[in-house]
Amino acid sequence: MSDEEVEHVEEEYEEEEEAQEEAPPPPAEVHEVHEEVHEVHEPEEVQEEEKPRPKLTAPKIPEGEKVDFDDIQKKRQNKDLMELQALIDSHFEARKKEEEELVALKERIEKRRAERAEQQRIRAEKERERQNRLAEEKARREEEEAKRRAEDDLKKKKALSSMGANYSSYLAKADQKRGKKQTAREMKKKVLAERRKPLNIDHLSEDKLRDKAKELWDALYQLEIDKFEYGEKLKRQKYDIINLRSRIDQAQKHSKKAGTTPKGKVGGRWK
């Protein structure tokens, strides 16, 4: 056999030995091992059961000293009373402090109220003085204006009296103008009085009042319509006047450039 074959045989032999060592033992051997372990643990259980238990005994009170339960209870009651008294004292102190704070707050409120009333009084007095001053200034201005008007009227009268006969015609024209204004004002009042009829509704029933209200509403609605129509008509007329004026201005500009005199208003008359 060569050296390589010898080495191969030795390796196979070694592998078989390793496999035998790693294989588990037979069942009989395993059972014996468990029995040995069980036998080893049994003495420990016996020892635990045989351990003696300690005996419990009541504490002994020294024979030389006696315990006074009444004294202990009295001390406890005194301690509770002291704590209760301390709580009562702290409560009354807090109550007293709150009352003092409340009194101080009321005093501050009253003081602030008095200060506010004084400020309002001073403000009202200043406002009254200001109103009086304004009234005095207004009266003074009115007096000065009346005096100035009187002086102007006197100057006008003197100037007119110096004109002689023309003064009477001037007064007549002035009276005529005043008469026209007065007549127009009276006519306006008359027309308004005719249109504004008295409203007698005290004797009307509910249905008639409803009809009257509807009638007034219709009249008011018609007046609003007329007002709107007149306003639109006035706008159109103003627009037409503006257009006419612009056309006249344009015509005058062209005529000036051409050197001709257009037909227009001269001396208050149209040519």
Swiss-Prot record:
Which SUPFAM superfamilies does the UniProt record give? Troponin coil-coiled subunits (SSF90250)
According to its UniProt entry, the protein's GO biological process terms are:
regulation of striated muscle contraction; skeletal muscle contraction
Disulfide bridge map? none
Asked whether the keyword Signal is assigned, the reply is: no
In-chain residues carrying the UniProt-annotated modification Phosphotyrosine: 221
Residues bearing N-acetylserine are: 2
Please list the residue ranges that the record marks as compositionally biased, kind Basic and acidic residues.
Answer: 29-53, 62-74, 113-155, 183-192
Chain residue ranges for the region called Disordered? 1-74, 113-192, 249-271
Phosphoserine sites (modified residues): 2, 90, 161, 168-169, 205
Superkingdom, natural source: Eukaryota
Q: Where is the composition biased (Acidic residues)?
A: 1-21
Q: Keyword annotations for this protein?
A: Acetylation, Muscle protein, Phosphoprotein
Q: Name one GO molecular function term.
A: calcium-dependent protein binding
Q: Which InterPro entries match?
A: TNNT, Troponin, Troponin_sf
Which GO terms of the cellular component aspect does the record hold? troponin complex
Q: Name one Pfam family in it.
A: Troponin
Family to which this protein belongs: Belongs to the troponin T family.
Biological function:
Troponin T is the tropomyosin-binding subunit of troponin, the thin filament regulatory complex which confers calcium-sensitivity to striated muscle actomyosin ATPase activity.
Quote the protein name from its UniProt record: Troponin T, fast skeletal muscle
Q: Which species is this UniProt entry from? A: Sus scrofa
